[in-house]
Amino acid sequence: GKGKELSDTEKFKIKEIVEGLRLYKPIQYLLGIADFYGMEFKVTPDVLIPRPETAELVERIITDYQGQAPRILDIGTGSGCIAISLAKHLPKAEVAAVDISPEALAMAEENARMNQVSVSFHELDILSEGYSSFMQEKQNFHVRETRFSCTRNKIFTYVKLKSHTEETEASLIGNLNCIVSNPPYIMYRREKSIIS
């Protein structure tokens, strides 16, 4: 049968996407959407595209905290894909996320609404004094376990935290159980070329 005629706007959009692909632009930026952990996330060049390898990190945390109510902090949240995925799959969790970029945080907040989860987002430079005071509010913890996973030259950090008291992790008030970060990375050769 005869298909529907494309509007001028649709034709222009298709032409724009084809041209972007010809210039090796990521399809996710061209479409404005990336799939991650069974969910859709809006993406722009203000945030990195969620990578499939990052799903391994999310899966590990979900497995470790299934059925619990952990307090989780995601540092450098970007699109919010880690924080939002954790909040979606750990419904009892209290998830906070920080990023230095207001544009990234706006995108992350939109993604949280789109995926119908509650995450507390904060604009924060982790190298600033503000980060120290933010963490002092959650100071009654020590590192119980640190895990590093290396996949395709990417290093993920996942820190499990435990209170100094003998209370169970799930009942902690104002303390973190887990800090997760998947910061952007630049390979050493590329970093040298950027600096020079």
Name the predicted role of every residue range.
Residues 1-14:
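A short N-terminal interaction module
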Residues 2, 16-90, 95-110, 121-124, ...:
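SAM-dependent Rossmann-like transferase core, predominantly class I methyltransferases
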Residues 8-9, 63, 196:
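Polar/charged alpha-helical tracts
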Residues 92-94, 98-196:
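S-adenosylmethionine
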